[in-house]
Amino acid sequence: MADKRRPQRDLPQINERIRFPEIRVIDSDGAQLGIITPNEAMEIADERGLDLVLVSETADPPVCRIMDYGKYKFEQEKKAREAKKKQHTADVKEVKMRYKIDEHDYQVRINQAKRFLKAGDKVKATVNFRGREIQHAHLAKELLDRMATDLATEADIQQAPKREGRNMMMFLSPKKV
């Protein structure tokens, strides 16, 4: 019975862990050695000082390769690290303002939004209302529409201006190149 406290590790099928009656073996150079028993393949791998690694379990018969497992594992980890470096998750950056914003402040917000969009992030443009300002929601909509037209070359509107509580917001996403 397996120990429930210790998580079962998914050990790679190499050398003695390969439990099939017959396997197709590929040499370290890529040449096929044919269909042989795992014991014969292990002897060949031991002679060369290499490991027998299960490559494809689903094939009939399963495919194994003679290689240096430590080097193979290192290469796989290196590829995974490189892939992780290259992927960029699109964050949602927020640009907040009031509907009575001055021109210079508005330009600062536009430049912020452009910088976020160039970095590949989505932008949430929010207009906050205080007190009775909520009566002027049409002015906030005009402001967000103006922002959308000013950013038309850099962004697509993901969600049109919409009022939510004491805020009006719009989502912009970077244009696909």
UniProtKB/Swiss-Prot annotation:
SUPFAM superfamilies: Translation initiation factor IF3, C-terminal domain, Translation initiation factor IF3, N-terminal domain. The keyword Cytoplasm applies. One of its GO terms (molecular function) is ribosome binding. Its main location: cytoplasm. It comes from the Bacteria. It is found in: Cytoplasm. GO terms for biological process: ribosome disassembly. Keywords: Cytoplasm, Initiation factor, Protein biosynthesis. One of its GO terms (cellular component) is cytosol. NCBIfam families: infC (TIGR00168). Belongs to the IF-3 family. HAMAP family: IF_3. Monomer. IF-3 binds to the 30S ribosomal subunit and shifts the equilibrium between 70S ribosomes and their 50S and 30S subunits in favor of the free subunits, thus enhancing the availability of 30S subunits on which protein synthesis initiation begins. This is Translation initiation factor IF-3. It comes from Synechocystis sp. (strain ATCC 27184 / PCC 6803 / Kazusa).
